[in-house]
Amino acid sequence: MCPAPLRLARLLRLLGVVGGLGVLFTACAAKDTASFSLNVVFPSTAMAIASDEVKFIVYDDPTPGACQRIYLKRISNQANLPPVVLDPPPVPVCDLAFGRGAPLDLPIGKHSILAIALRAKQDLLVGCADVALSEEGGEVVVDLALPGSTPLPPLSTCLSVRDACQNRCQ
């Protein structure tokens, strides 16, 4: 059995180690974030007008070519996608068109950002961008495309997204 002062010293040392590990794990668990605005490029004005809203999903997959795999899995309805970092609610197309989409706080690092233009809650256009997000924030732009198996929606008489958003079309 240890004398009382020696037991107290060991206990204090043990508490110091446990406390230090707690601080280390807390620091490692907290990820730095930065503010980014997410935007899309539609293949045509007609396809932008045909879309109701855009959903963005941020995946944690820093491997090269991740977006191609994520895109193919999405359009073929496969479920084994990488871990999701952020899955905010969809943004109306008119909000994006007029710059009213709110910036999002995204974790710093390499991610894949999938954008899905929805029409009647169904995938219409899909795109993905592999990005390295830095502390400076900024804008991430994703090019959208019509997956091969998706039927074309009926075309609007509108000539601009602004007219469609302001209900100026017949």
Enumerate the predicted regions with their spans.
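Bacterial N-terminal signal peptides that target proteins for export
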Residues: 2-18
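Tryptophan-paired
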Residues: 57-136
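Compositionally biased low-complexity segments at domain edges in trafficked proteins
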Residues: 139-170
